[in-house]
Amino acid sequence: MDWIWRILFLVGAATGAHSQMQLVQSGPEVKKPGTSVKVSCKASGFTFTSSAVQWVRQARGQRLEWIGWIVVGSGNTNYAQKFQERVTITRDMSTSTAYMELSSLRSEDTAVYYCAA
């Protein structure tokens, strides 16, 4: 498995005191270096259009690393400089889903990726 490695995406969930806020992410992905991956984060239980969705990742034994965010209502994005050339964060308001696409994958991109709102 020299050229195949796993990028793992977990289910993220958040619970509010008086509401059921939930973010459900797409499942595990196995990709080859040089390809791209697009993962999703579906929101429910809160007003998606009034939120911002953040994406972070954590490689084994490393600290959380911020990738970027999108303001859902306006579509404005902000990316960490490290990922500027390789990441695109989008959203689909009709399905309350945010997406993070990472291109030109490298072995160093092997990590657990999380969304948060």
Swiss-Prot record:
Region (Framework-1): 20-44
Residue ranges occupied by any Ig-like domain in the UniProt entry: 20-117
Residues covered by region (Complementarity-determining-2): 70-77
Signal peptide (from-to): 1-19
Region spans: Complementarity-determining-1: 45-52
GO molecular function: antigen binding
Sequence segments annotated as region (Complementarity-determining-3): 116-117
Record key words, sorted: Adaptive immunity, Cell membrane, Disulfide bond, Immunity, Immunoglobulin, Immunoglobulin domain, Membrane, Secreted, Signal
PANTHER family: IMMUNOGLOBULIN HEAVY CHAIN
GO (cellular component) term, any one: immunoglobulin complex
Annotated stretches, region: Framework-3: 78-115
Disulfide bonds: C41-C115
Record region (Framework-2): 53-69
Chief place of localization: secreted
Subcellular location: Secreted; Cell membrane
Self-association state and partner proteins as the record states: Immunoglobulins are composed of two identical heavy chains and two identical light chains; disulfide-linked.
GO BP term (any one): immunoglobulin mediated immune response
Role according to the record: V region of the variable domain of immunoglobulin heavy chains that participates in the antigen recognition. Immunoglobulins, also known as antibodies, are membrane-bound or secreted glycoproteins produced by B lymphocytes. In the recognition phase of humoral immunity, the membrane-bound immunoglobulins serve as receptors which, upon binding of a specific antigen, trigger the clonal expansion and differentiation of B lymphocytes into immunoglobulins-secreting plasma cells.
Protein name: Immunoglobulin heavy variable 1-58
